[in-house]
Amino acid sequence: SNDTHLVIAGRNTPYTKEIEAWTKNHNLSDRVHILNNVNNDDLAGIYQLATCFVYPSRYEGFGLPIIEAIQCGLSVVACTGSCLEEAGGDSCLYVHPDDVEGMAAALKQLLNNPEERIQRAQKAREYVTRFENNNVAAQVQQQYLKTIETKRLSMKK
């Protein structure tokens, strides 16, 4: 709808200039807001003010921005084909990175269905608790103990 705003937060790159030019040429400058080099404190505030989170990344080391958004209570639209599906779990919507119409449809789906958006965000929040430091540490400890026990048993044979 015409009251929807898009906030793009990231590094200032040559591509940023292309986005700014496209936005201006399509008379969207009043609804598309580009924020460069946002610090973590400001980023948390942006997440808190958002309705949902779109992450159209083709390549990603792990998908930390998705987890951050989910931890702030946001539902997520992200791309298929990288680690993002593992980072976000089944409650996020995933679209092929070249599917512009699919990305728009997924975003509209979340914007137009507040109950679904909230349910997806809650389920995603439950999913990402597995990545919290204390849970990861406990999982690593369990794996070490299992490995030690396996070694111990194999040495007895």
Task: Give the ranges of each region predicted by the language model.
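Glycosyltransferase donor-sugar binding loop
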Residues: 5-20
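Nucleotide-activated donor-binding/catalytic signature segment of Leloir-type glycosyltransferases, i.e.
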Residues: 17-44
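Short alpha-helical donor nucleotide-sugar binding micro-motif in glycosyltransferases
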Residues: 38, 45-50, 55
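Aromatic "clamp/platform" in nucleotide-sugar-dependent glycosyltransferases that forms part
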Residues: 58
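Short hydrophobic beta-strand element within catalytic cores of glycosyltransferases
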Residues: 66, 71-78
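Conserved acidic donor-binding segment of nucleotide-sugar-dependent glycosyltransferases
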Residues: 79, 93-100, 109-114
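A short, well-ordered alpha-helix in the C-terminal region of glycosyltransferases
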Residues: 102, 109, 116-130, 141-142
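C-terminal alpha-helical cap of glycosyltransferases
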Residues: 133-157
